[in-house]
Every structure is written in C-alpha cells, then in structure tokens.
Amino acid sequence: MGKEEKTHINLVVIGHVDSGKSTTTGHLIYKCGGIDNRTIEKFEKEAEELGKKSFKYAWVLDKLKAERERGITIDIALWKFETPKYHVTVIDAPGHRDFIKNMITGTSQADCAILIIAAGTGEFEAGISKDGQTREHALLAFTLGVKQLIVAINKMDSTNWSEPRFNEIVKEVSNFIKKVGYNPKAVPFVPISGFEGDNMIQPSTNAPWYKGWNKETASGKHSGKTLLDAIDAIDPPTRPTEKPLRLPLQDVYKISGIGTVPVGRVETGVIKPGMVVTFAPSNVTTEVKSVEMHHQQLTQGNPGDNVGFNVKNVSVKEVRRGNVAGDSKNDPPKGCDSFNAQVIVLNHPGQVGAGYAPVLDCHTAHIACKFSELLEKIDRRTGKSVENNPKFIKSGDAAIVKMVPSKPMCVEAFTDYPPLGRFAVRDMRQTVAVGVIKSVEKSEKTGGKVTKAAQKAAKK
C-alpha cells in the first residue's frame, strides 16, 4: 500500500464472559499492534512474578482494562492493530461496566462485531442459552446498526480441533444469528485458539480438515483462513460525508482572545470555515470562523473528526453540551416536541408503563424523557406488532413508545442520522433499555437568534 493512508475501521468484540474475549483481543493487539515490546516485557515479568504463566495475552488486556477502569487514560494506541488493508481500533469489549451505554452513545459506531464463541463442552451451550449475554450483545449490535459480523469459534484446542464439534457449533450459531437478524452467508466462521494463538494470524496446522471460511456480501465473495484474514475482508465502511451536517457538542469553551469554541465530533456531513450553522434546540444561528483539530487549522472537518470551531457573537450561555450544530441552509437541526422509538427493555426489575420518566443518553445529550404512550408491543425479531396499547412492558419486551423530553432536545430518526437516532435509557445507575428512533415531531420554532456574523455571511 506504500505510504497511502489505510482506512480506519472500528471493531467491537462481543460474547459470553468466559469465551476468551480478552485473550483473543489481546493476542491480535500483541501480534499486530500498538503494544511496544518494552511494555510487553514489563507485563511478562510482572506476570511471571505473580505466577501467571497463562499471562500471554489476557494479562495485557487486564492491565489495560484495570487502568481504564481506574480512570487512567491509557494510550489509546494500545487498542489498535493493523491488517494489510485497515487500521483497526477495538472500541470496546463488553464486561466493561458501561459497554452497552458506550455502544449506543458511543464515541464511534462499530463497523463490525466479532462474536467470540467458546467451543468447550458445556461452555458453548452456556454462552448461547436463552438468558445468555451472547444473545443480548448480538441483538444490540444488530439493532444499533452494526451491519457486519465475524464469528470466531475459540478454544478449539480444548476440543482437539474436532471437525464434528466445529460443524455442530457453526450450525447452531448460524440459526442463532439468523434469529437476531444477520445473514449467516455473509458471516465468516473462523476456528481459533486465542490462547495458543492458533489460526489467528497464521493458518493453523492442527486442522487439516479446515479448508477456510467463505462469505458473500454486496461487495462479492470472499474467502480466507485466519481471523486476521476475516477482519481484513470487512467491507469498507462508507462515511456519511454527503449528508447534511450534524455535530453534537461535547463541550463549549470560552477562550480569551478567541471567543466561544464549541467542541464535538462530526457525525455526518462536513463543517468548514465560512459556513453558517444553526444550533438546536437553542435555535441560535451564526458563522463558523475557523475549524481546528489537534491544534491544526482545517479547511474542513469530516465525519469522525473531533473538532473545535470558533463562532462569533455567541456566548457560552447560549449553546451547551447536548446541542447539535448543523448547516443552516441544508436541513438544519431542530428541537423536538416528541418522538416515537422502538425501545427494548434489557434489565428493569419491575414493569414499565406510561408515565415512566428515566434519563436518556442520546449522542451527547443527557435528558429525562417521559414514556408518554406505549403504542404497541412488537416481536423483537420481526418488528411485527403483537399487541396494541399494552399497559406495561417488562424485561425482554420490545415496544414502540411515544417519548416526550422534559426539556428541549435535538434527536433524529435512526434511518436519517444513525448516531442521533439511538439512545440508552438509564435508571438505577444502569442501562435499563435501549432505543432506536423511528420518527420525530420537530418543534417549528421561529424567531431564533441570528447573529450579525450570520447576516453578513448570508450577504456574501
């Protein structure tokens, strides 16, 4: 590839607690990635002192996780690795307390999920049982728009690389992911041993029967042997540059000598100096004077970029975290009076009825919203209605709900602007439900503030 920039992709790793996620992820990062030898040697030494011979890779990840949990920001390079085609970032692995919330409000949308399944006797069955986390994670990934999936069948060494066991698991898992919504034909099934590092990067020599994986997607047929091959064969993501701008604000700074600087991640569209932007729901319109990222001036900010931009005649009191910036001339963002969403209740101890008012985390907004009407209960898999106007919904149920925010907020339909159309419902310090927004009733407010800078720019 020479010096050309490789495409960046984001991976999320899902699967049951003991499926070997850490070991497998650790191995990829260890072998293809961002962990330098010095760090590895340090970890290896510590592992030996603790008698953790099994260290190999999980230890690396445990160290990173522990540091992350304690709020030590670790060098994010540690969560990166490379394939021939891609720069890969592992954006999260479950088990992390806020996994579900991260996956929804997530700083980034995953392009692909790797589902890790343990092949050991009894282990596989436990992971995929009715109440299994595996089902929940796979369903979440699918519901939240992670379109591509890779299945890694791990711990094959514990089955002596048994072909019948592999085939049995492939058959079961195919049925399982089909129920969730994925097409098994588009999914590579890769036998591996994360612990031994077998068939991860180099083809295994332990499975003469294994001819490799195949998948067929919109981009054609692909085949390969190893897990790394499967990651390299992910269909390249399309970044939503063509859509109108949506930029949820993470913070707003006041910088002396410069003025007001909102900061956030461009989710769709582009932002450039000279553009006249509208903030919703605060309904303020002004001109963008400059855009920068990592202290460098940009001619434009693209989807995925975390940018700061300087705006004139707007005080820090007028725009805040949770507001959304958009192009005033191209489908500008608006506040909403209410919205309808498909809500899936994950773990709520009681019943949820009309009037329930938990906090919603949607992009960077964190606002209490009332479940004002339960419109219909639906089958999670097919999306078909099974009951109109149910009185209550409980854990495991999915429903279309009319939601009313307690104060102005800006959201969008998931089909129009995915990152602004999915949310986590938080209550009792945990994620009790997730939702995907179907339609939005926008506030048709007129007479918002239009700054002098915006009026001038309009005349140009």
UniProtKB/Swiss-Prot annotation:
Modified residues (N6,N6,N6-trimethyllysine): K80
Residues with the N6-methyllysine modification: K3, K31, K317, K391
Residues that hold GTP according to the record: 15-22, 92-96, 154-157
Sequence segments annotated as region (G4): 154-157
Region (G3): 92-95
MF-aspect GO terms: GTP binding; GTPase activity; translation elongation factor activity
Transmembrane segments: none
GO cellular component terms listed in the entry, alphabetical order: cytoplasm
This protein's UniProt keywords: Cytoplasm, Elongation factor, GTP-binding, Methylation, Nucleotide-binding, Protein biosynthesis
Residue ranges of domain tr-type G in the record: 6-241
Region of interest (G5), ranges: 193-195
Positions carrying N6,N6-dimethyllysine: K3, K317
Annotated localization: Cytoplasm
G1: annotated span: 15-22
Modified residues (N,N,N-trimethylglycine): G2
Main location: cytoplasm
InterPro entries: EFTu-like_2, G_TR_CS, GTP-eEF1A_C, P-loop_NTPase, T_Tr_GTP-bd_dom, TRAFAC_GTPase_members, Transl_B-barrel_sf, Transl_elong_EF1A/Init_IF2_C
Region ranges (G2): 71-75
Pfam family, one: GTP_EFTU_D2
RNA-binding listed as a keyword: no
Family of this protein: Belongs to the TRAFAC class translation factor GTPase superfamily. Classic translation factor GTPase family. EF-Tu/EF-1A subfamily.
Function according to Swiss-Prot or TrEMBL: This protein promotes the GTP-dependent binding of aminoacyl-tRNA to the A-site of ribosomes during protein biosynthesis.
Name of this protein: Elongation factor 1-alpha
